[in-house]
From Swiss-Prot:
Keyword tRNA-binding: no
Species of provenance: Methylorubrum populi (strain ATCC BAA-705 / NCIMB 13946 / BJ001) (Methylobacterium populi)
Annotated binding of [4Fe-4S] cluster 1, by residue: 11, 47, 85
Cofactor note text: Binds 2 [4Fe-4S] clusters. One cluster is coordinated with 3 cysteines and an exchangeable S-adenosyl-L-methionine.
Claim: Iron-sulfur is one of the keywords in the record: yes
Protein purpose: Catalyzes the methylthiolation of N6-(dimethylallyl)adenosine (i(6)A), leading to the formation of 2-methylthio-N6-(dimethylallyl)adenosine (ms(2)i(6)A) at position 37 in tRNAs that read codons beginning with uridine.
PANTHER family according to UniProt: CDK5 REGULATORY SUBUNIT-ASSOCIATED PROTEIN 1, MITOCHONDRIAL TRNA METHYLTHIOTRANSFERASE CDK5RAP1
Family of this protein: Belongs to the methylthiotransferase family. MiaB subfamily.
Annotated GO MF terms: 4 iron, 4 sulfur cluster binding; metal ion binding; N6-isopentenyladenosine methylthiotransferase activity
Protein name per UniProt: tRNA-2-methylthio-N(6)-dimethylallyladenosine synthase
Amino acid sequence: MKKAYVKSYGCQMNAYDAGRMADVLAAEGYSATESVEEADVVVLNTCHIREKAAEKVYSELGRLRVLKGERAESGQDTRIVVAGCVAQAEGREILSRAPAVDVVVGPQSYHRLPDLLRQSRETRVVDTEFPVEDKFDHLPARRNRGVTGFLTVQEGCDKFCAFCVVPYTRGAEVSRSVAAVVEEARRLVEGGVREITLIGQNVNAYHGDGPDGAPATLGHLMDALSAVPGLLRLRYTTSHPNDFADDLIAAHAGNPLVMPYLHLPVQSGSDRILHAMNRRHTGDAYRRLIERIRTARPDIALSSDFIVGFPGESDADFAETMRLVAEIGFAAAFSFKYSPRAGTPAAEREDAVPEAVKTERLAALQQLLDQQRHAFNAAAVGTVAEILVEKTGRHPGQVAGKTPHLQAVQFDAPASTIGTLVPVRITRAGSNSLFGEVLEGAAAAA
């Protein structure tokens, strides 16, 4: 049987797309392999958000060129595919920089991958079009891969933040219908998935057709998904502060399947930098939104993204970011040094922050965020949380899962608990995960 190796870089959307590409190849008779050395087709599903991520891809392609040559010497053919956002952004340039690549395919065209592979027998192929037809209408049934699963409900972004390539690589905002999303969710749950994370570049801008033909909101969509038998948990990512509607806040307060965890990027605490980033909100507007959300769901865990060293960022601007973080408090966060991306407005600016200053600011911000994360985890010790068991643990007799607040937990319990909710008393907090013990009688009941 032919074998396919699919590697994904970057965001949850890429992870979803990588899984769907594996499904497309499986429908063509390819079995999945974890060994790139034995793969007949190698797919790199790429990320273009930061320069470092893109360069990782080219480094990997250099290694694959050697592997392809070695396999050819033994009479084995290898097709190399570059998919995702680097493919969309750089197109034919990839063929020039990486001679071993056979197919370049964008994130809206990968449903055509089998045809592109066949064409590549004659000539190298690039397909980065935004097709008129919806790719989701052409994808095969999903193959389930665990207790949790991603489900794309929205793609693209219309915000055009000054630093971001997503509007150029993923296109304008489009949403799937409520019926299509619910049907995919139903199939996932029938296959064993118990927690679904709804994903989109700007997921709370969701506006898919509802049952009556009118646009539905993300809150309405989650209400519809809550009726899927067997579904235990719902999450969603990533959101923009400007699209956070009242019905979504109400879903956190009133829908028991919606978990008390929210990833809501702010990027900076400085109004001057937020304006330069074209974020369309202020630091105080973000604070007021968080206050409303916490009023509706006091136990919610907050996560965010931060960029340090955006062009023109002064010491005073960075101090505003530190002040916002200190005032709000985050359970988790992702912070990065600004990386210019070709074609974005920010890349044209000439007031770059020195690399040494970026590094210093990132270290200071990360130290504060780490302190907040450790404090949040430590506060869980002594409490009881319902853990959705996802897999076996690192040690014999151990399983692992997550709290409603997305904290990883390890504890002793039989493998039969996988896919169930188990009440666990948290006994210890590590640097990146929690440890606990099952309440007496709970594991046996599960």
